From Swiss-Prot:
Its main location: membrane. The gene is asqG. FAD binds at E33, V47, R113, D313, A326. Its cofactor is FAD. It comes from Emericella nidulans (strain FGSC A4 / ATCC 38163 / CBS 112.46 / NRRL 194 / M139) (Aspergillus nidulans). Pathway: Secondary metabolite biosynthesis; Alkaloid biosynthesis; Mycotoxin biosynthesis. This is FAD-dependent monooxygenase asqG.
Length: 566
């Protein structure tokens, strides 16, 4: 019996991550890359966040990535006039305490896209399975197999095909073409309409940046445009210039840009301040690499057809201003690798039904995780580009209130809900925040009807407490009565429920935590697990969802709260 074979189209971050996972799992694969070499000088830099670093650690790659990457220790934002409007750092004991309590143990870092691809490629033991200069020309079914015809006429047959060939995926185009003929209800034309573009971006690099600015991510705000500047310890620096398009375009109408378009954007905005003392024009003159591309944004509602599945930018694409794209690609590849391994544990030759189940699970997980990241990136872009007076006010006046503890909370939520590969050795917890898989009281989905029922119940309990108090005579020095405490507790719960409704979170996932700390400082910790220095009470299910900040409740304080994890 021939070994189950996975054909990977594209030597991208997602494609090479999947190749590494499959190799670790002993699953045969063939990777086809259309370009003459693996890891060409395309793109500028990518940011690897804690959830991605955890997966790279499982593959044994964290140390090598850290050698080549620059950690992000500070985040600063600059207004149109060149003054700082945001400086996120742990600048006081309060911020440091909360940031430490929410630590994941992994520092976000940026690395050249080419370097990350090289790390992934170099880690492969069986490099003979990777073939350059072989792009996809056509897909067709061959019984219970898939036949791939490459651009040079070579035919390769496998059990499944994984399209990891980017935003302009040839694999995606092929399955849409096939589905249009075989199953018009698949809706490929509707899927294509979800691919939209509202911004374009100049990706660039200089080799003579100021290394004294390293380890800081700079974001420059301008009207209908924005800039990201990432200097490294070596003096190399990466920059991204985002420009809002005149109108939103969809799929085939999304423009392609020429060198003349790039020159025009630079000429129009050369005086924009990137950091104090450095303009966009100055930076562009010193560029060693640069390109102007459209920024597609989308999440496909369907990411597979029969025995072909899409990963990475082929299925979801977000604005790079938050640096989350590579992380999603790594996570998706790791998840799909786990699902393929799981199917093969049931049968060495999984049936169509078994593979469809695996792909559907991957699709649903992607649709659960990716939307918030795509929406966050879109919102950050709108804020940075000062798109309207309200966003201008928020960016230039309110953003300066952001602190390290608030940033740490967002990182903790993202990390805790990330994926961990099931069939590789599980790593010890590095920071204070665990993954959901390590939490006993995991969050659950809850229907809105249950939330409404709890609201009614809590209102009833609050009313009982209030009625009882009307019949009690309390002296000035009398301690608070138990029913008053009941009323206050109920009011607290109602406020959580109200916050949940306001944030549109009814029916989403939440977990209740309750911590005591003799120090009197009780930072709100993440997702159902307390470090040793805290004494957790029994976690209980509650309805609603809220993300509170730190609470200082006095010596021996006690804190209950709910943390968003979906």
């Amino acid at each position: 019996m021939a070994a189950f074979t996975v054909i990977i189209i594209g030597g991208s971050i997602s494609g090479l991550t999947l190749a590494n996972v499959l190799e670790k799992y002993g699953i045969k694969y063939i990777l086809l890359e259309k370009r003459p070499s693996i890891g060409p000088q395309l793109g500028a830099t990518v940011v690897v966040h804690p959830s991605g670093l955890h997966l790279l650690s499982q593959l044994g790659l964290r140390e090598r990535v850290e050698e080549l990457a620059t950690p992000v220790e500070l985040q600063k934002a600059i207004g149109p006039d060149g003054t700082f409007v945001l400086n996120i750092a742990a600048t006081n004991q309060c911020d440091r305490t909360i940031a430490d309590a929410l630590s994941t143990g992994y520092m976000p870092m940026f690395i050249a896209r080419q370097d990350l691809i090289k790390v992934l490629y170099d880690n492969l033991q069986d490099k003979f399975r990777v073939h350059a200069s072989l792009g996809l020309r056509e897909l067709e079914w061959a019984g219970d197999k898939v036949k791939v015809t490459t651009t040079d006429g070579t035919s390769v047959v496998g059990d499944i095909v994984v399209g990891a060939d980017g935003a302009n995926s040839r694999t995606r185009a092929e399955i849409w073409k096939i589905a249009d003929v075989e199953d018009p209800s698949y809706g490929s034309q509707q899927l294509a309409k979800s691919i939209a573009c509202t911004y374009r971006c100049v990706f660039g690099m200089v080799d003579d940046g100021d290394s004294s600015l390293a380890r800081t991510a700079y974001l420059a705000f301008q009207y209908n445009r924005a800039y990201t500047y990432l200097p490294t310890d070596s003096g190399r620096a990466y920059f991204l210039a985002f420009f809002k398009n005149p109108a939103k375009t969809v799929n085939d109408a999304i423009p392609r840009y020429s060198d003349q378009d790039e020159d025009a954007d630079v000429a129009a905005h050369a005086n924009d301040i990137i950091v104090p003392g450095l303009t966009f024009g100055d930076l562009y003159k010193r560029r060693t690499r640069c390109t102007l591309v459209p920024l597609q944004e989308y999440l496909l509602d369907k990411c597979f057809y029969k025995r072909v599945v899409l990963i990475g930018d082929a299925v979801h694409k977000l604005n790079p201003i938050t640096g989350r794209g590579a992380n999603l690609a790594i996570e998706g590849a790791a998840l799909l690798g786990d699902l393929i391994k799981h199917a093969l544990e049931k049968s060495l030759q999984p049936t169509d039904e078994m593979l469809q189940t695996a792909f559907f699970t991957y699709q649903q997980c992607t649709k659960s995780r990716a939307p918030s990241q795509i929406d966050d990136a879109h919102r950050v872009q709108s804020l940075a580009a000062l798109e309207n007076p309200l966003l201008k006010f928020m960016s230039l006046k309110l953003l300066k209130r952001a602190t390290a503890d608030k940033l740490a909370l967002g990182v903790a939520v993202d990390f805790s809900t990330g994926h961990s590969m099931r069939y590789l050795p599980q790593l010890p917890q590095r920071g204070m925040v665990p993954l959901n898989k390590d939490v006993v009281a995991n969050p659950e989905h809850r229907p809105a009807s249950s939330t409404v029922l709890w609201i009614i119940l809590m209102l009833g309990m609050a009313s009982l407490g209030a009625v009882w108090q009307k019949h009690q005579r309390a002296e000035e020095d009398q301690p608070i009565h138990g029913y008053t405490l009941l009323t206050l507790s109920t009011f607290y719960n109602l406020m959580i429920l109200f916050a949940s409704a306001v944030h549109g979170s009814l029916g989403r996932r939440a977990v209740n935590l309750s911590f005591s700390d003799d120090s009197g400082m009780v930072p709100f910790y993440a997702v159902g697990h307390a470090p040793d220095k805290y004494r957790p009470t029994t976690p209980s299910r509650r309805v609603g969802l809220l993300v509170p900040g730190p609470s200082y409740l006095g010596s021996g304080g006690h804190f209950n709260g709910l943390l968003e994890v979906a």
